C-alpha cells in the first residue's frame, strides 16, 4: 500500500504525520511518499492534496505534468483527499476570485468553489463540526477557508456551516475545507484510509 502526498507546496509534513498516526491507530502499514514530480502518482494507491496556496499548487501541478496523472488516478478509482487549497483543486468550477487568478482546477468533483468563503474577518477559526460519517462533533480548524457553493447530483454533502458546504464526497474523491492535519483527531484521515483498505 502506497499513499502519495502532493509535496510541491503546503502542509505536507503535517499530513504525513497524521497519516502515520492514523495507520498506527488501525494497526496498518503503508508507505507514504512525497510527490514532487511526474511518475510517482501512477505508483500510488491513494493521494492527498494538502492545504497551502491553491493558485501556486495548481500552477506547479500543471507545470510538473502531474495533473494528467491525477485525473487518470481518479478514473481508476484511486481514493483522493483534498483539504483547504486541495479542496479547491478538486473542483470543476470556481468563483470570480478563482477565475481572476487563472487558478488551475482538476475537475475531479462536480462542485463549484468560493475561494475565500468566510471573508477576511475570519482569517481562521475552530468549530465543533457535525460530519455525516462521524457520531460526535469534530474540532475543525479553518484557515482562510474555501467553501463549496454548488454541488452536482452525484456529490454527497458531508458537512455544512451556515449553509456553506465545507465537506463533500463524490465517488472516490473527498474534499474538506478545513485542515484535519492540524488536530489530534484522526477520524477524517481514518475515513480516507477506510477507502484504501476496504
Swiss-Prot record:
It comes from Methanococcoides burtonii (strain DSM 6242 / NBRC 107633 / OCM 468 / ACE-M). It catalyses: aldehydo-D-ribose 5-phosphate + D-glyceraldehyde 3-phosphate + L-glutamine = pyridoxal 5'-phosphate + L-glutamate + phosphate + 3 H2O + H(+); L-glutamine + H2O = L-glutamate + NH4(+). This is Pyridoxal 5'-phosphate synthase subunit PdxT. GO terms for cellular component: cytosol; glutaminase complex. L-glutamine binds at residues 52-54, 115, 143-144. One of its GO terms (biological process) is glutamine catabolic process. The active site is at residues 84, 179, 181. NCBIfam families: PLP_synth_Pdx2 (TIGR03800). The lineage of its organism: Archaea, Methanobacteriati, Methanobacteriota, Stenosarchaea group, Methanomicrobia. Keywords: Glutamine amidotransferase, Hydrolase, Lyase, Pyridoxal phosphate. Its EC number is 4.3.3.6, 3.5.1.2. It comes from the Archaea. In the presence of PdxS, forms a dodecamer of heterodimers. Only shows activity in the heterodimer. InterPro entries: Class_I_gatase-like, PdxT/SNO, PdxT/SNO_CS. Catalyzes the hydrolysis of glutamine to glutamate and ammonia as part of the biosynthesis of pyridoxal 5'-phosphate. The resulting ammonia molecule is channeled to the active site of PdxS. Gene3D superfamilies: 3.40.50.880. Pathway: Cofactor biosynthesis; pyridoxal 5'-phosphate biosynthesis. Belongs to the glutaminase PdxT/SNO family. GO terms for molecular function: glutaminase activity; pyridoxal 5'-phosphate synthase (glutamine hydrolysing) activity. PROSITE patterns: PDXT_SNO_1, PDXT_SNO_2.
Amino acid at each position: 500500500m502506497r499513499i502519495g502526498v502532493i509535496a510541491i507546496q503546503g502542509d505536507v509534513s503535517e499530513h504525513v504525520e497524521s497519516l502515520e498516526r492514523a495507520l498506527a491507530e488501525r494497526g496498518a502499514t503503508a508507505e507514504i511518499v512525497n510527490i514532487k514530480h511526474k511518475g510517482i502518482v501512477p505508483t500510488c494507491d491513494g493521494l492527498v492534496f494538502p492545504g497551502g496556496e491553491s493558485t501556486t499548487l495548481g500552477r506547479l501541478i500543471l507545470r510538473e505534468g502531474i495533473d494528467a496523472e491525477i485525473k487518470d488516478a481518479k478514473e481508476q478509482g484511486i481514493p483522493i483527499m483534498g483539504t483547504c487549497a486541495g479542496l479547491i483543486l478538486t473542483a470543476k468550477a470556481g468563483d470570480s476570485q478563482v477565475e481572476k487568478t487563472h487558478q488551475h482546477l482538476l475537475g475531479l468533483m462536480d462542485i463549484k468553489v468560493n475561494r475565500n468563503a468566510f471573508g477576511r474577518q475570519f482569517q481562521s477559526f475552530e468549530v465543533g463540526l457535525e460530519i455525516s460519517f462521524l457520531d460526535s462533533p469534530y474540532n475543525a480548524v479553518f484557515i482562510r477557508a474555501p467553501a463549496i457553493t454548488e454541488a452536482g447530483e452525484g456529490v454527497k454533502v458531508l458537512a455544512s456551516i451556515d449553509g456553506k458546504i465545507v465537506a463533500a464526497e463524490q465517488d472516490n474523491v473527498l474534499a474538506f475545507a478545513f485542515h484535519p492535519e492540524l488536530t489530534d483527531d484522526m477520524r477524517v484521515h481514518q475515513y480516507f484510509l477506510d477507502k484504501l483498505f476496504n
